[in-house]
Each structure stands twice: as structure tokens, then as C-alpha cells.
């Protein structure tokens, strides 16, 4: 059985060589993430060019995702490598541009002293160090250390429950987006999205640089993003549940419930939902995952996530290939236990369906009734395939498209196996070509039942209006 839940791997120093990238693709990497919070353009371009060379030589549609640094707040540098803070210590954050020491450190946001108040909690390094604001004196925020720890330069700052008036895009983000357009990235994973206007701002920048065909995945990382999830989902092409910062900004115990709710909303929209952060975190150091991590990945699959993601496990861990292999095994085992018919019955068609809704729903129902081996979907923009897969059919969906960009973008959609095809000029040819491609790729064999969907006029996005069910017969092609 073909794996339906897709896997994203973050590239980094641990997978620098073309040979390692080839091994990742063979093992099951569907998309490669480039984390622009680290490294410069030259470093990322080197990895990107290697990946493109490898995926082209293997003829595999591996998508590329540029993950922005986003409008975050960090501490700046110290006069030593690191400092140690203990509970009860007094420690100061300042918006002045000074070199830090054991008593104070500068922050990257120049207006932080205007937006915090006495009594507020400030978390540093994903909450490993906790401060309580005592008083504000000019540009200095004097705090008491509540949870001590070791601090080094450039660690993140979170202030739970406080809306900080940061811009949606920084100058670095704009430069990075331009780089993504110039180098043909498939997706922008936009960090710290708080409202739909943030997504629209990114679309404007993409349009300015000629990147209208790059899709936006909004990362939900704070309470404001959670509160505005419906409008963000509407404005975006996909959602990432970024559980690292999200679990710092809101109580960690609430994250599993939010994960389920966000995935459920994404399912209804047909847009891909990525579950990310610390999924197999122990495999950065160890060759096997913990039992809790195995359960975490499996439960994301049971929730219906489109993708699961590896971050530090593949970017900088000691066991990148083993981490991916472990994730593939967990996903496949979890998928085998899913009752797709029961799941399909839960995913009702929309209250006011259009023709496309009815056709894609009927495709899945017909495939279930006939126990079809595959659904074959001719799609110009990729939307038809995504709309089919929101109903989570038991069989895989072969998506035929004439655009290489669309082929790669479909690589992160649940259950979709995208193929590139030439131009066609008749519906009969669409149907026969769909079967030919599925046969060639080994998805079906002679005697299998398939359900095919397409639309007329040919080549027009959103025109899906035809269904055909047939037995595969090579002699009739």
C-alpha cells in the first residue's frame, strides 16, 4: 500500500552531500525544508542546487519549502560564550545596543520596553529560562529570574499572552522571499502569522518579485494565530502547526487539542496541514525514537495530518537517515490501522456544494463502492486532487498535470501521487492517458478498477465535471 501521509525533511549540515540527499529521497522524503532562521543565501543555494540535481536525476517531484525567520524577538550577544542564571537573580533586558554580560543583555526589538509591564512573564530559549518583570526604567526592563539556566547569544524571547506590535515581514524576510522567487521555490512557510493581513502582505511581496505561483503555508505559533485560524486558513494555501513556539506562547497541555482542531479545519478546506516540531527529537542524539515520539507521530496520522515534519533530526542530527526511516515505518503502520470507510462517512460534503464538490465526493464514494485501486485525476492547478483527498479515500490519487510546478506542489498533499503529462485535446485522450500513466508508474495493473475524473473545457482550473469508472485493459489503450 502506498503511503498517504507525506514527510518533510529539513536540510542542513547533516545531509549536505548529494549522496545523502539521494538516500533521503529513496527513503521517503517528499519535500525539503530550508530554514532561513539559520545560514545565509550562499549556504542555502548550495544545498538547493544539489537537491535539484539529485531530484531531476531521479525524476522525483520533491517540493522545496523556504521557511522564513519571521518577526521574532531575540536576545543579542554576550561578552562571553554563555552566562548562568539562577532562580532569584536580578537580570535586565535592555533595548540599548550593548554587549551583554552576567547582569543584562540587549534585545533585537527596540520597543520592547514600551510593550511590557510589571508582573509579566518573559520566556527565553523556548521557556528554558523564565523571567518576571519587576519594573521598567527607561530602556531597561528589570526582571527576577524564576527559572534559571544557561544563556548564550541569539536565543528566542516569548511573552505569552501579549500582543507585540511587530511587522508581519522584516527586511530579511523580504530579501529571503526574493531569493525564493529567483530560485524557484515551491512554498513559503511564513513564520509567526497572526492574521489574514499578514498572509496578504506576503502575497504582495511575492507578486512584486514575480512569484505568484509560489504557495504560502502559514505557521501557527501564537495565541493570536490560533484565534484567527479561520481567516488565516482562508487566505493561505496550507497551514503548519508549529508546536515549538506554540507550546511556549500557550500552555503546552493545550497544544494536542489545538493540533486536532487545526487539522480538522484543514481537512474541510482541502489544503495541506503540516504537523511539525520535535516529532522524533531524541533521534538528534539517539538511533531510535522514544515510545512517546512514536505515539506522537502515529496520532498525527490518526488526526488526518497531510504531512509530518523532521527538523533538527535531519538538519543537524547524528542519525538523519535513521530518523526518516523510523518516521516512514511509523506512518505506514498507523495508516494500515485506519478504517477509511468510517473516516469517509465523517467527512460530509459541504452544506452548499458546487459541481466540483459533488464530483470529488462522488469520486471517493465510487472508489469505495468498487474497491478501486486508484483514483486518477487530471488537474491543471492541482485543486481537483486536493479536493478529492479532503475526503481521505482508501486508495491513492494519481494526479496528472501539465505543469512541473504544480506536480511538485502536490507532493505535500495527502494521498496524492503527481505525474507530469503532455498536452491533450480531447476527454477520451485524458481518460486513456490517465490509465497509461498509472500503468507506467506501477500504481495499477491489468484488471484493476480505477475511477477517473476530469473536466471540460480542457485546461480550465475548477472545471472538474466528469467521472468515469473502468477496468484497466492495456489492449484498449
Predicted regions and their residues:
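Non-catalytic helical/linker scaffolds that mediate oligomerization, partner binding
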Residues: 1-477
